[in-house]
Curated annotation (Swiss-Prot):
GO terms for cellular component: host cell cytoplasm; host cell nucleus. This is Protein E6. Signal peptide: none annotated. Its main location: host cell. Transmembrane segments: none annotated. It comes from Human papillomavirus type 61. The gene is E6.
Length: 146
């Protein structure tokens, strides 16, 4: 990566004077072009642009899902509850940058608190703490109530 290559999708658009709607990125794994939905998800998940031979790449949804699962299976270390994470790191959950281990979206403070209140484990995978975002937690059970 060069010293001035942007790693954020919005900085890429700004630096190269390209509208987000006109941006085209190729998946670093399968080399397919990202769809508009995948570009939006890439931006929402705050994923980093990868540079190969001075060319920017993103990641498509199927490849991201596969790579996240591979990372979890190969690099899972241990799991524990929120208070233990805080004791281990010496920092509050609010200060920690925690991503969803299923989709890679950064967790909001509310999602972190939900995990604590619902007694759901955080997972230490590849040297980073991960959890589950609200979209990956599972279906809403409220609609199943009589």
């Amino acid at each position: 990566m060069g010293p001035c290559n942007p790693t954020n999708i919005f900085l890429l658009c700004k630096d190269y004077e390209v509208d987000f709607e006109d941006l085209r990125l190729t998946c670093v794994f399968c080399k397919n072009e990202l769809t508009t939905e995948e570009l939006l998800a890439f931006a929402l998940k705050e994923l980093s642009i990868v540079w190969r031979h001075n060319w920017p790449f993103g990641v498509c949804a199927p490849c991201l899902a596969r790579e996240v699962k591979v990372r979890e299976l190969r690099h899972w270390d241990h799991s524990c509850y929120g208070p233990t994470v805080e004791q281990t790191t010496g920092r509050s959950l609010a200060e920690l940058y925690i991503r969803c281990h299923a989709c890679s979206k950064p967790l909001s403070i509310q999602e972190k608190e939900h995990q604590v209140q619902a007694y759901i484990h955080f997972h230490y995978i590849a040297g980073q703490w991960t959890g589950r975002c609200c979209q990956c937690r599972g279906p809403c059970t409220a609609r199943w109530q009589p």
